[in-house]
Amino acid sequence: VSVEQLATRNKIASAAYADAQTSVGTGTLSITVNGESFSVDVESGSDSLEAIRAAINDAEDNVGVSASIVNDENGAQLVLTSDNSGVENAIAVSVTTDLADTGDLSQLSYDPNAGSNPMIEKVAALDSIIEVDGFTQTSSDLTVAGMIEGVTFNLSEARPGEKMTVDVSLDTNAVKRAVEGFVQAYNNLNT
């Protein structure tokens, strides 16, 4: 068995702004994850990084993206993180700006298929990849099931190219607990 890669959640970040209260412009952000989209209207007076973060997180139709603000030595950045791991959960952000927009909301756009974007990918959306006896299986999370009948691999660390030996055995304690639970339930029913 070789764990070639672990699934990760996509994370993208804006350029740095002076602070989280900085106005970034007005318009509409359309955020897409796994083929589903939702929109956030950004209006004058609620166009700061803080307000946009809140609008994304509070959107009732949010399709699986969490927004946060990270402050580093360069300033405040809006960070979007996919709620689920895997390639299909890559984040895309398109922007429609208002004609009267004096800011530059388009700096919050991101296309995972484009070579250059205003927002920067901090963590790529990846699937887990496991190899067993020359057979490869991918999974959008850290669990690989069905590759070998009755066996589920719970992945915790990738070691590309490094082969590991896995012993598969029956968990007799789990069987014992299941039988004891059945007997207890049966006895409770008959008393």
Go through each PLM region and give its residues:
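Bacterial flagellar/type III secretion structural subunits and associated motility module proteins
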Residues: V1-A76, T81-L189
